[in-house]
Amino acid sequence: GIDHYLFTIQSSASELLLNNQNMVLQSAEDISAFSTPEAYRYSELMKNIKIANSMIEDIYLYYPVWDYIVGTEGCYNSRNYFLLNSGLSSKGYAEWKSHILESDNINFFFSPLGKNEEKLYFRQQIPASRERDPQSILIIGVNDTEFMRLLDMALPNDDGTSIFVLTEEEQLY
């Protein structure tokens, strides 16, 4: 069921965070580390994980020290990565940076997108403890359409059933 798909997202996240290339980029001495063939191969790996999993809309790792992102779209500073994903509009960049990149959320969480829209994200960081500043932050955006399709499949066809998503902070959706 749905749990299986969410678990797959979590295991992809672990695989990417523990990847040697993530360790290299976390301790990058300068910004040129983000334009190496290895960094681009890492981006390709994310692209392949996305292609293999219809639940995943986007995957990227954020490196706060350099304000740089390596993701399915390539390797860019956070602003340019956002522009690439938003049809070159910078509207919403500040919110995205504070709600997603610099969020305190760990694991699955919903973030407001627009007026009545919420989007499901998965977020992990290294180090995992909040006492130290994160060196790398992994974000996976969940594909809403696919998520809703799975919810529909999980629901029996009578009208009296509800499905709840309970986050680790005990937030109910």
What label would you give each PLM region?
Residues I31-Y42:
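Signal-transducing coiled-coil linker helices
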Residues G1-F7, A13, Y42, Q125, ...:
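Short intrinsically disordered, low-complexity coil segments enriched in acidic
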Residues L18, I59-D67, S162-Q171:
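Short hydrophobic alpha-helical segments used for membrane anchoring or interfacial signaling
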Residues K50-G141:
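Extracytoplasmic/periplasmic ligand-binding sensor regions of membrane-associated signaling proteins
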